[in-house]
Amino acid sequence: MQGAWVLLLLGFRLQLSLSVIPVEEENPAFWTQKAADALNVAKKLQPIQTSAKNLIIFLGDGMGVATVTATRILKGQLEGNLGPETPLAMDHFPYMALSKTYSVDRQVPDSASTATAYLCGVKTNYKTIGVSAAARFDQCNTTFGNEVLSVMYRAKKAGKSVGVGDHTRVQHASPAGTYVHTVTSNWYGDADMPALPLQEGCKDIATQLISNMDINVILGGGRKYMFPAGTPDPEYPNDVNETGTRLDGKNLVQEWLSKHQGSQYVWNRQELIQKSLDPSVTYLMGLFEPVDTKFEIQRDPLMDPSLKDMTEAALHVLSRNPKGFYLFVEGGRIDRGHHLGTAYLALTEAVMFDSAIERASLQASEQDTLTIVTADHSHVFSFGGYTLRGTSIFGLAPLNALDGKPYTSILYGNGPGYVGTGERPNVTDAESHDPSYQQQAAVPVKSETTVGKDVAIFARGPQAHLLHGVQEQNYIAHVMAFAGCLEPYTDCGLAPPADENRPTTPVQNSTTTTTTTTTTTTTTTTTRVQNSASSLGPATAPLAWHYWPRR
């Protein structure tokens, strides 16, 4: 897969070495008509005031507004366009808001505390998941009595099917927010936990994945946390570093299978496609790597499913429930690419994330499905330098810096791309387009950091209009619960969707092919060429919203 991405990027780098200006854009009538068309659409926009049968939330981990914009440019350039004018799938969603991402104890949050906010409706502390702010990081005994419930849990309680699909490990902080209660977000398996919290009764995240609630679809990475220590990995049987890690000797996959009729476990793309299309399958677990799934450019399309594949498979299985479903999908490797200071990895992941959103939009009706796209936090990622229209998103600014050397449009505020030699290194256009290139950073840190900026929320479907203005991040969970008439909003007073009894007929499964093709859309325009150097959420929710029932 990496070769295909490289060829595409080389192609548009050569094509876009000169800035191009569409001649029609020089005419004011072009922009007047464009605005008039958008205005006509806006005037006809009517909120869908029914309840939502289905609930989908797409989480772009670390996908701040700058990342969204850069992804839009990359997508457009991969399609042969100039870039910024090309819409993303999420751009077509009619409602938008901003989300305040701070956690209770941190101005700049992490993926754990934010997941608790947008999935459980309660803000909490740094590195804790599924617990209130009364719990303390790394203090096991503060977990009990401070657990909070997710919207997914409430959807399951209401009779819906539920699922998670992720491009990281399924025990990662973001998907874990749908099912776990932990004061330490990296307790992936029991081997990752100290002795004391185990003695005090705290459970690792993998154990809670199969025991806290009844999840119909689980797709992502994280195999090694599910099997006894030393168990050979099916994909890498001779690699001792990829064997199972569980010290309690449990086979959690087998335990999960034994609980459910109609359940299947898969570990590669072909099996995923086959089982998801089997109408007898109502429970599907797919774990495709020992830890995190591969970056999109490194993915083997014959062995490893894309996030779009996982989304489509999940929707096939979940849609078999006439009462509807709840689905969480995360583009988790966007975040990892940014932490590495490697924008190429982050943005190519974001392009695939957007394709998963597009696939879900084709499979799920806007009339009965509330779909939300958002991010947990942003990153110290930016792009600038007055680059000319059509310049590769990975390219150089048109003018050199004060030291006489070129610099990339994309830069990081901190990260591993800092070079402390006393002299900023030169960077060439070829280097800046290398998939492994780490953009220069102002401050040296081992892993680039998140930021405290607001992030965008995109929404469509029933009650999507409630996502407006600037909101606290936990408001997202309350909108989803209200739209689905789930606790604590079971008396929502909303009529059912008009087509609630319509059988779900997903589009033809696009993952049945074993080769990957890229469709290129070319927009023909007349151009001129320029030379280029290269909080309205409830103040207090009912008690049932906040606390997990003791067992």
From Swiss-Prot:
Chain positions carrying an annotated carbohydrate: N141, N241, N426, N509
Annotated region (Disordered), positions in chain: 496-537
Gene3D superfamilies: Alkaline Phosphatase, subunit A
Source superkingdom: Eukaryota
Protein name (record): Intestinal-type alkaline phosphatase 2
Catalytic activity: a phosphate monoester + H2O = an alcohol + phosphate
Residues at which Zn(2+) 1 binds: D61, S111, D376, H377
Signal peptide: 1-19
Biased composition (Low complexity): 511-527
Function: Alkaline phosphatase that can hydrolyze various phosphate compounds.
Active site: S111
Organism from which the protein derives: Rattus norvegicus
Amino-acid positions noted as binding Zn(2+) 2 in the UniProt annotation, renumbered to this chain: D335, H339
Subcellular location: Cell membrane
One Gene Ontology cellular component: side of membrane
Subunit structure: Homodimer.
